[in-house]
């Protein structure tokens, strides 16, 4: 059983997934910091400093419905999703440019038969002209 588990855990795609989760977590922190410390203060300046987390609170005591916190979370999500979308779009464009630069079509080499056929074609064109 241990051998099977070790085999499963050491497969390439499992390791890739683990690395992706770690990098995704780190990238998530970067995007969250970008949103909280740069984008949201700018949005706050543009909207007159509106902070929805203290707004739209219904009820009292422990039984409170905090609609403002929910709306703020939706706005944060949309901004984070847009930032990730833009980052992925830029990375995709850069990757495509690198692939286009690397891919060069090799010139096809003609073998003896193709060369002979090409000469025959050229001779026929001369006779028709």
Swiss-Prot record:
GO molecular function annotation: mechanosensitive monoatomic ion channel activity
Keywords annotated in UniProt: Cell membrane, Ion channel, Ion transport, Membrane, Transmembrane, Transmembrane helix, Transport
InterPro entries in alphabetical order: Mechanosensitive_channel_CS (IPR019823), MS_channel (IPR001185), MSC/AndL (IPR037673), MscL_channel (IPR036019)
TM ranges: 14-34, 38-58, 67-87
Pfam family, one: MscL
Any one of the GO CC terms: plasma membrane
Compartment list: Cell membrane
Protein topology in the membrane: Multi-pass membrane protein
Coiled-coil blocks: none
NCBIfam families (alphabetical): mscL
Function: Channel that opens in response to stretch forces in the membrane lipid bilayer. May participate in the regulation of osmotic pressure changes within the cell.
Quaternary structure and interacting proteins, as annotated: Homopentamer.
Assigned protein family: Belongs to the MscL family.
Protein name listed in UniProt: Large-conductance mechanosensitive channel
Organism: Lysinibacillus sphaericus (strain C3-41)
């Amino acid at each position: 059983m241990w051998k099977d588990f070790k085999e499963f855990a050491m497969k390439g795609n499992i390791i890739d997934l683990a690395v992706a989760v770690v990098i995704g977590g780190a990238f998530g922190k970067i995007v969250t910091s970008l949103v909280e410390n740069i984008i949201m203060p700018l949005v706050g300046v543009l909207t007159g400093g509106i902070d929805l987390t203290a707004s739209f609170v219904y009820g009292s005591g422990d039984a409170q419905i905090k609609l403002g916190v929910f709306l703020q979370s939706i706005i944060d999500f949309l901004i984070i999703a847009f930032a990730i979308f833009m980052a992925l779009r830029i990375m995709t464009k850069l990757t495509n440019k690198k692939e286009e630069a690397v891919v060069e079509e090799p010139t096809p080499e003609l073998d003896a038969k193709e060369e002979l056929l090409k000469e025959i074609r050229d001779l026929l064109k001369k006779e028709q002209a």
